[in-house]
Amino acid sequence: MSAAQIEGHCLCGEVTARAIMSKPMMRACHCDMCRSHTSSMFMSLGIDEGSLSLEGPVKTYRSSEWAERGFCGTCGSTLFYGTVKDGARHPSAGLFENAANADLKLEFFADQAPGYALAGTHRKMTAKETIALFAPETGEDQ
């Protein structure tokens, strides 16, 4: 599959998003911070590294020693989850119409999902597996 340019926007339309997506995939995170930030799980799209461009009133919140979250300064829409160390940005699937037609491929903190389950045969990582992948130095959640 060839790379596709995807475009989207926040709820009020003041923040626009553009990215390149070579391998369409959607991910879900059920960690405490994502659930607090979104009132549910956080659904993100797997995009090509460094390809996310956001224009408009973007605000960020440093949610932990190694992570930050982006949101629209006007309407509050969740824009991305990011890791501070490498500057990676994982955009909210909801910014893009039909989540850019990406299929759910991976769940993080699947063992912490509160009373719901996502259907499918995608990979489901536990909290321990997720922390080992993203925060091996600290062992800290989110």
Per-region residue spans from a language model:
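A short Gly-Trp-Pro
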Residues: M1-Q142
